[in-house]
Amino acid sequence: MDESYTQRFGGIGRLYGAAALPRLQAAHVAIVGVGGVGSWIVEALVRSGIGELTLIDMDDVCITNTNRQLPALAHTIGVSKVDVLAARVAEINPACRVNRIVEFLTESNVDRLLAPNFDFVVDAVDRTSIKALIIAKCHSRGLPVITSGSAGGRRDPTAIRIADLGHAGADPLLRSTRQCLRRDYNFAKSEQGRPVTMDIPCVFSTEKPVFPWADGSCSLEPESGAETGLRLDCAAGFGAATFVTGTFGFVLAAEVVRRLAAVE
């Protein structure tokens, strides 16, 4: 390690032990989805001394991202999120290597995009089929992976938890992901209604989501006749706040750093 690295990240060494710094500097982490949750993961990982990041996302910054996403600034509207974050990483730690992949991960490119021997893969996308695809591919290759539940509609950052995917409760996004993994990828099913450990860590909220209503009000109950499968998107769907999406990202990053720092 050079002097600039130890100056920047000596505080991390005093938190996890000096022996952890070379491991963090040598680590390569992929973040799939760098929006409301993923952008904060990138921020936390580069500030924790991770030496190489692969950022995977095809979205551009939109003005409606302002309430929840790190790259959303007045001068970045319309710019690739991956490019904005890569530039930010370079300002934080110029020695951090960043691989920019301006693509959405799909069935047709998953083998190529997840081909490197990543030390960790972080799933921060909000489509069930793609979450299951990422998890299944990493599981089959022996790549450590962690996945995020839904941050949309939540107000309370203190309700965020980390657990095994098989024990993640009623989070609808993770519940659908579990079902997809069991149906399409032969993951173990629950036994007599009891959760089965899946060896996949996940971050989720125990808070009930707040639903937006057409009249501008919000409720813990979905509006009659309205779409129930709301997503966190730019113009409609669940609302979101940075203090929740950021906390999701930081909890995910904390678990990645904890595991990487402990690996001999």
What do the predicted segments below correspond to?
Residues 50-93:
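Glycine-rich phosphate-binding loop and adjoining beta1-alpha1-beta2 segment
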Residues 1-30:
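N-terminal charged helix/coil linker that caps or initiates catalytic domains
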Residues 45:
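Aromatic pocket-lining residues of Rossmann-like dinucleotide-binding sites
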Residues 31-33, 56:
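Conserved N-terminal Rossmann-fold NAD(P)-binding element of oxidoreductases
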Residues 2-3, 116-120, 125-133, 140, ...:
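Glycine-rich phosphate/adenylate-binding loop
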Residues 37:
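Hydrophobic/small residue at the entry helix of a nucleotide-binding pocket
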Residues 78, 82-119, 125-128:
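A structured beta-alpha segment of the ubiquitous adenosine-cofactor-binding alpha/beta core
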